[in-house]
């Protein structure tokens, strides 16, 4: 007879450390849930355009709930066209499909496109109403250091996110909406022949051959240069966030270095299979003096490539095991 066991495992080895000049950073191996690096991970900071991911997440959610359609055409308000910076160059005479708006945000980082979606999804038809909705939804997703004042990351003293929250958000987009996530890897998007010089995706990792397929850059003078990135190599996916970098070129170099470090310094290994017995525990008043402790699921761990450290299995028995026993 065995008990199924969810145990605590401690890896004693070390990988080569990664030094980043970013003000804040977070690197996650999505496949195993292993956090590879944290720097000021919970500090609320200006997220710039990276916070557009929350607008996108909610739009994807509304589409899947049947509350919004990709082919639905939305009007463009005066409030939307007043935004400058990165835009789709929308006019108030336009009626734009939701699908074009999504690509306008993902590829072109359109501030105006965010507002069009926000006003359509807001409970009261305003961008502020949608921003409040974003904040409440973020809290339900476990993003405890995020407050939204607008839909596009336009500088505002109250508009903040932590890099950990951005990683949570990116992870949810990848996991929850694979059918829309592929848009993030698109290199170009041109809306109605407007601003042909502004059609390329700003993600510096796309096309480098390192598996990068998302997500979103951001920049303001206060926030510096940032990127929420993701890359898939084989069956492993890495998600990372950096912010507060000093230039566009530094951001590109830092992001590429992170991807290379995460994949080259760590590998996924299997240390046990479901129902494998990894230890024993004493039993009171039983026919047998001990019972086997088995894994409830496969044990796949992320470990440093060049480390031969050992895995320590620690099983914590919180209550005495008394006979009679049943499996499970």
Which residues does each predicted region cover?
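Bacterial N-terminal signal peptides
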Residues: 1-10
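Generic marker of residues within folded, mature protein domains
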Residues: 7, 15, 37, 64-66, ...
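Active-site-adjacent loops and short helices of periplasmic peptidoglycan-processing enzymes
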Residues: 13-178
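Domain-terminus/edge residues, biased toward the C-terminal soluble/receptor-binding domains
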Residues: 144-147, 155-328
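Glycine-centered loop/turn positions within well-structured domains
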Residues: 1, 34, 112, 298-299
């Amino acid at each position: 007879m065995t008990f199924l066991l969810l145990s605590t495992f401690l890896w004693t080895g070390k990988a080569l450390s990664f030094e980043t000049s970013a003000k804040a950073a977070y690197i996650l191996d999505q496949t195993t849930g292993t956090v590879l690096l944290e720097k000021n991970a919970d500090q609320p900071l200006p997220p710039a355009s990276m916070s557009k991911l929350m607008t996108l997440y909610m739009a994807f959610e509304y589409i899947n709930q049947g509350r919004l359609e990709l082919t639905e055409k939305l009007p463009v308000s005066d409030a939307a066209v007043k935004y400058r910076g990165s835009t789709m160059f929308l006019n108030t005479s336009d009626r734009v499909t939701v699908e074009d708006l999504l690509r306008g945000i993902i590829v072109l980082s359109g501030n105006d496109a965010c507002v069009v979606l926000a006003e359509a999804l807001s409970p009261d038809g305003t961008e502020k109403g949608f921003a409040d909705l974003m904040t409440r939804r973020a809290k339900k997703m476990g993003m405890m250091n995020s407050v939204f004042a607008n839909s596009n990351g336009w500088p505002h003293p109250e508009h903040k996110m932590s890099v950990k929250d951005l990683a949570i958000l990116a992870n949810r987009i990848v996991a929850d909406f694979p059918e829309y996530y592929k848009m993030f890897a698109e290199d170009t998007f041109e809306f109605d022949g407007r601003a042909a010089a502004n059609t390329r995706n700003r993600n510096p990792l796309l096309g480098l051959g390192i598996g990068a397929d998302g997500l979103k850059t951001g920049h303001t003078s206060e926030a510096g240069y940032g990127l929420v990135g993701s890359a898939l190599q084989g069956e492993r996916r890495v998600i990372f966030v950096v912010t507060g970098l000093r230039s566009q070129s530094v951001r590109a170099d830092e992001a590429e270095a992170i991807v290379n470090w995460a994949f080259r310094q760590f590998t996924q290994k299997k240390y046990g299979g479901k129902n494998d017995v990894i230890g024993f525990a004493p039993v009171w008043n039983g026919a047998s003096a001990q019972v086997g402790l088995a894994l409830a699921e496969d044990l796949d761990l992320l470990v440093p490539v060049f480390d031969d450290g050992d895995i320590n299995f620690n099983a914590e028995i919180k209550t005495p095991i008394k006979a009679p026993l049943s499996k499970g």
